[in-house]
Swiss-Prot record:
Assembly, per entry: LSm subunits form a heteromer with a doughnut shape.
Top-level taxonomic group: Eukaryota
Organism of provenance: Encephalitozoon cuniculi (strain GB-M1)
Primary location recorded for the protein, binned into one broad class: nucleus
Family per record: Belongs to the snRNP Sm proteins family.
InterPro entries: LSM_dom_sf, Sm, Sm_dom_euk/arc, U6_snRNA_Lsm2
Listed name of the protein: Probable U6 snRNA-associated Sm-like protein LSm2
Name of the gene encoding the protein in the UniProt record: LSM2
PROSITE patterns associated with the record: SM
Taxon lineage: Eukaryota, Fungi, Fungi incertae sedis, Microsporidia, Unikaryonidae
């Protein structure tokens, strides 16, 4: 749930998504669910896929995502680091 909370707090910001199929997509994050399924608005396809050039809105299944790039936000990064450390400490205690 750590990454879900991170991306949920990034709704409305620009993200770039690399899919396992090799498609590179950029857009504004419109929504996300706990399975990391994404909804993107104002979509631009950054790789050479001519059939996808006219898409403006898309939904991406979480299991097809290779990685996601977001703008660096120091406050969010500190929250993710703190959450990761806390989870590691709790796992060692139990």
């Amino acid at each position: 749930m750590l990454f879900y909370e991170f991306f949920r707090s990034s709704i409305g910001s620009r993200v770039s998504v690399m899919l396992k199929a090799g498609v590179y997509v950029s857009g504004r994050l419109g929504g996300i669910d706990p399975y990391l399924n994404l909804s993107l608005l104002d979509v631009r396809i950054l790789s050479s896929h001519p059939g996808l050039s006219s898409i403006s809105v898309c939904s991406i299944r979480g299991s097809s995502i290779k990685y996601i790039l977001v703008d660096k936000d120091a406050k969010l990064l500190q929250g993710v680091n703190a959450g990761s450390r806390l989870r590691m400490i709790l796992d060692k205690c139990y």
